[in-house]
Amino acid sequence: EQVEFIKKNFKYGFGQHSGVIDFTKNAYELPRFPINEKYGDLKRFEFILNLFPIPYKKLDPVDKFIKKNNNPPSVQIEFFSEQKNIKNLNCFSNDGKDWGGPEMKFDENKLFIKFNEKFEFRRGRLNCSLKEGNKWRWLGLQFTVETD
């Protein structure tokens, strides 16, 4: 019901997760980087401006609403075969109470992510970065977590 209302009345929507917009992103879940007094110094701003996306071919789950029976979710990301050095990807998530590294396994250009703990109420996030030569790539995902 909410999704249909948004699609009818808006062209784009932004999430509460960091990332770089590219052709693979959902127009109603666009990532953004906050720029404010806490996260707005010039060095960070320059870093953000120079980030590149990490496009993907397929992302599962498509529905990022986490209910009690699927917390933590299983995440699978299939990257394009042209993406270089994808196995050098580093990911961090805020499952549990702290940011840490989830378990990551690759099969060719597919990444399987297993979180260590359940996500807390409200918002769960996964941030992945990849250093490629002298540039950085970034992928961020957001989950909405059901209340207890």
Give the positions of each predicted feature.
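Acidic, His- and aromatic-enriched active-site or binding-groove loops in soluble protein domains
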Residues: 10-19
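Terminal accessory/targeting
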Residues: 19, 23-27, 31-148
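A generic structural signal for alpha->beta connector loops
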Residues: 9-10, 27
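Catalytic cores of alpha/beta
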Residues: 3-6
